[in-house]
Amino acid sequence: ILWATGACLFVRTATYKEVGGLDAGFFAHQEEVDMCWRLRSRGYRLVCVPQSIVYHVGGATLNAESPRKTFLNFRNSLLMLYKNSREADLKHVMRIRFWLDYIAAAKFLMEGHIQNAKAVYEARKAYHQLKPEYAPKRKENLEKSTLSTIPELMRDSLILAFYLKRKRTFKAIKDRR
């Protein structure tokens, strides 16, 4: 697997420290995905134990409809992509992401969620402001990466596969990498 939810994630302390742990700048959204991506790119295996039972109160930090939650999800995922995407992939990924973000903002507007639409724009603005601060982290992540590709990373967008290609299960997506 590429990542595991922070609600049920175990990482050895030495390994956690080695990869820099959770990014404190991500507060409450996507920090575990970012860390797992760094773990995976440095050759660590992430495993799932399907027999596990976990109880988690999702959305306890921020309500699902909260513009702050929308802001953090969009900003943090942009920063995560910037921090971890290979140089060869970054421009392509960000170009697609640009359009997907504005489609999402338009959808929020059409649904009457004006503050969530604004949050998407604000997240993009914050990403561009924070990008120079994250450049050293990106450099370190790419330098310490031991894998040229991560098999679990999808080549195409999961969002496009779901909405445009009508792929409703992960198994239905044939070419993940």
PLM segments and residue spans:
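Glycine-rich phosphate/pyrophosphate-binding loop
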Residues: I1, F10, A135-R177
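Aromatic-residue hotspot detector
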Residues: L22, F27, N116, F162-Y163
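A short, conserved alpha-helix in the catalytic core of glycosyltransferases
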Residues: L2-I53
